[in-house]
Amino acid sequence: MKTYINPNAEQWNELAERKTVATADLNETVKAVFNDIQKNGSKAVKKYTSYFDGVSIENFAVKSSEIENAVAQISSDLKNAIQVAADNISKFHNSQKEIPTKIETTSGVFCWRESRAIDTIGIYIPGGTAPLFSTVLMLAIPAKLAGCKNIILCSPPDKNGNINPAILYAAQLTGVTQMYKVGGIQAIAALTFGTDEIPKVSKIF
C-alpha cells in the first residue's frame, strides 16, 4: 500500500482515479461462463474455481465436520457479538410480518392479501480478505422468518479450499440448509441453472 502525505494539487486528479473495467468485455466473460456451466455443470464450475480462485475443489458441499471445526475456531467474544446482531436483526424483521386482514367486500365475498415465501433461495456471501459474515445474518434471518424452506449459501473458498469459519458459524446459527464452497460468476451461474452438486434456486440474494 502506498501512502501519500500532503500531495501536491497537481497529483489530486491522478490519485482520485479508479480503475475501470470495459463493460463489453465483462459481459462477454459472464455470458461465456454462464453458457459453459449451463452446458457442463459442476465440471465447468470446478474449472472456473481453479481459474479465478486458484484452488482445486473436489466436492463443493460443506461437510458437517467442517462446520464443527469452524465453530471451534470462533472465539466466545465473536460468537456473542454475532448472537447479539442476530437477535437484533430477527427483532427488526419480525416486526415486518403481515397481520392477515380479511375484508368482506360484499355479502359472502372475502378478500385479503397473502404473502408466501419462496421455497428455495440462494444467498451469496463475499469472502476473501474481508469475509462478510454479517451478510449471512442480514440475508438468512429474514429468509428463515419468511418461511423459506431451503436456503442455499455459496461463498468463495480460500487457498486451502475452505470457507471462512465466521461465515460457516453464522450460517449454521441462522438455519442455512446447505453451504457450498464456490464463489464469483460460477457460483451465480450454478445457482441459476443447478448442477449435479449445487441445486437450482428460484431467487438469488
Where are these regions (language model features)?
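Conserved small-residue-rich beta-alpha loop and adjacent elements
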Residues: 103-169
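N-terminal Rossmann-like NAD(P)+-binding subdomain of aldehyde/semialdehyde dehydrogenases
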Residues: 1-119
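Conserved NAD(P)+-binding/catalytic subdomain of aldehyde/semialdehyde dehydrogenases
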Residues: 175-205
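Short coil/turn connectors at secondary-structure junctions
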Residues: 98-100, 116-120, 146-151, 174-177, ...
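Active-site-proximal helix-loop elements at catalytic-domain edges
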Residues: 1-13, 165-179
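Short alpha-helical
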Residues: 43, 131, 186
